[in-house]
Amino acid sequence: MRIYNTATRQVEEFTTYVPRLARGYVCGITPYDHMHVGHGRVYVFFDIFRRYLERLGYEVRLVINFTDIDDKIINRAKEEFGHEAYKRWREIPERYIAEYFEMTKKLYIKPAYAYPRVTENVEDMVKWISTLVEKGYAYVAPDGSVYFEVAKVPNYGVLSRQKIEELVAGARVEPEPGKRNPLDFALWKSWTPGEPWWDSPWCPGRPGWHLECVVMSTKHLGAPFDFHGGGADLIFPHHENEIAIARAYFGVDNFARYWIHVGYLTVRGEKMSKSLGNIITLREVLSKHSGEALRLAYAMSHYRKPMEFTYELLQQAEDMAKTLYTAYDELSQALRDAGEKDQEPLAQEALKYAEAFYGALDDDMSTPEAVQQLYGMARYIISTVLHKIEKISRETALTILNKYVEMADVLGVLERRQIPKELEEVVKTLVEVRAKLRQERQYQLADYIRQRLAELGVELHDFGPRTYYTYRR
């Protein structure tokens, strides 16, 4: 598989430091408001990327953080709670972290390896800052804040391809008392009365944003790890500053091999913003459309390109999802009508879609082409395979169905055909019991188990001593 690396501006062969283990970190939300469709695009892409790596045989350790203390959270708490904000500010991140898990579940995003929170790692961050001060890469300002000295790190700007002189002239950096350089950034922010704080050797305060992600990613994944991701808006200054901190702390050029960024999402040609009043929340969209339709809508655009979000696109994706389910449902039910041997080479033609599907994902995660191949296979199943089902063996029909489901699993669609977790172990146990009953020629009881499972939507397919099962909603 080849993937575009923002650090090198090239599409590169994907390799990992540890064979068959892919370690990655994706910057998570600052939980101070509702998630919007731009957030969804980022997390769905990395979920598809993770699923494809797993299909290739990798164990994937994906870490996603929560920045659960930040100026935005503090300001939101003041708006909602007034003078009680100091006591109740934690209610804000808790509320929106809960929403994160609710929305990602509806989007069928698989759970991460870890979800570290800033507030649970402050002690580690203080230790990092102490080390950076000792090494001469950070300095203490008169108010007790600690700043990272950008000029001390060679090749600053390597990720965003900008020079320090240009950044100083045009960077969006607010001047702060105690800074030696406008580009220097806070590792530790001194306490403001009425706001949350933690102890440190310098003053009461809280950690800075850029430091937080470096500490949490390397704590869970080690350094260097394989890939670091997020939205394209994080390239500068956030990811640039992460690289600078890690260079100073570890003495390595890059603490992540691949930097992967997802393009902007626009509404009517403009980025979403509160001032324009064009923010579309995930809750709003998922109250009207399925998570699978939204996943397909995201996947119809290449992850690195800007994506224009429209409800027309979402309806197109919804219609596509219906076709995908029709192919699955009808082929699952038609398996019983398959013949004993193959009379036509339908499987070879069907599996060409799978070959093209995986070829597209191998080529820098080209999900638009992958979606078209999955959709093409669905249409082929409906238009051709089902009409000639009696001319292929049941095993061949099941091979086609399994490959189709395998492709859908990578994109995270057809998820509603999955056996509910609370049923899955029971089904497996009943299939094993039924196999023993068949061996003992207790066919009446074996047939009863098949019948009862069918009533739950679980269809059993016997091929000699082997039994496969499919699930219908």
Curated annotation (Swiss-Prot):
MF-aspect GO terms: ATP binding; cysteine-tRNA ligase activity; zinc ion binding
A single Gene Ontology CC term: cytoplasm
Organism field: Pyrobaculum islandicum (strain DSM 4184 / JCM 9189 / GEO3)
Residue sites binding ATP per the record: K274
Subcellular location: Cytoplasm
Gene from which this protein is expressed: cysS
Name this polypeptide is given: Cysteine--tRNA ligase
Motif ('HIGH' region) on chain: 29-39
Binding, Zn(2+): C27, C213, H238, E242
NCBIfam families according to UniProt: cysS (TIGR00435)
GO BP terms in the entry: cysteinyl-tRNA aminoacylation
Reactions the enzyme catalyzes: tRNA(Cys) + L-cysteine + ATP = L-cysteinyl-tRNA(Cys) + AMP + diphosphate
Alphabetized SUPFAM superfamilies for the sequence: Anticodon-binding domain of a subclass of class I aminoacyl-tRNA synthetases, Nucleotidylyl transferase
Gene3D superfamilies, alphabetized: Cysteine-tRNA ligase, C-terminal anti-codon recognition domain, HUPs
UniProt cross-references to SMART domains, sorted A to Z: DALR_2
Cofactors that this protein relies on: Zn(2+)
Matches recorded under InterPro entries: Cys-tRNA-ligase (IPR015803), Cys-tRNA-synt_Ia_DALR (IPR015273), Cys-tRNA/MSH_ligase (IPR024909), Rossmann-like_a/b/a_fold (IPR014729), tRNA-synt_1_cat_dom (IPR032678), tRNAsynth_Ia_anticodon-bd (IPR009080)
Short sequence motif 'KMSKS' region: positions: 271-275
Cofactor note: Binds 1 zinc ion per subunit.
EC number: 6.1.1.16
Record HAMAP family: Cys_tRNA_synth (MF_00041)
Family as reported in the entry's similarity comment: Belongs to the class-I aminoacyl-tRNA synthetase family.
Pfam families on file: DALR_2 (PF09190), tRNA-synt_1e (PF01406)
